[in-house]
Amino acid sequence: MRDLELDIISPETIHSGRATDAYFERTDATLAHADRTPQVVAEVTADQFPTGEFALLADHAVDVDAIPPGRCFDGGPVMRISGPYRDFARLETALLGLLSHASGITTAARRVREAAPDSPVLSFGARHVHPSIAAVVERSALVAGLDGFSHVAAGDQIDRAASGTMPHALLLCFGRGEQEAAWQAFDAAVGDDTQRIALCDTFSDEVDESLRAADALGD
């Protein structure tokens, strides 16, 4: 039965083990048919999926050891799962997907952080992913050491206010020659807790618009 809004697989489906590769279902069926329940130690290695995500395994009779989120590493297993294989076999696909996606984002964000160690760096990556996983993107950016993120609903999810600048759309709505009016309207409209960051490249080059913004807004 297919009832997916926006092609989103529900958390309940993921926890149930249905969000898996077909061969894991067939493996489970084969082991059940053969009446085999092997005790195993599964390792997640560094060339696959670094970091830890335990909630998916919380209701299963397994022991999990892993390095904490945000820990830098250089080779070796980063997670071990010990227990009856059939208890978590169907969860492998979802588990590795959770770890791989988040750690890939964190690694990329960390490279930016290291390239600009003394500058404020914000994540605007949510516009490039499915909206249902925006909180994954923004949390991963924070784990990497970025200073903030742009996505409002993600902020609700992880209990941290979103931040950002202003979009080109705002300047375009005011029109060419009205950049000062747009910057001043933004300054007047937003709260005192919002940073004033004027976007200075919509109609003219950055130098020209930066000078105009400084003149229009002052200190």
Task: List where the protein language model places each region.
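Glycine-rich phosphate/ribose-binding loops and adjacent secondary-structure elements
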Residues: 171-191, 196-219
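Ordered alpha/beta subdomains of enzyme catalytic regions
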Residues: 1-192
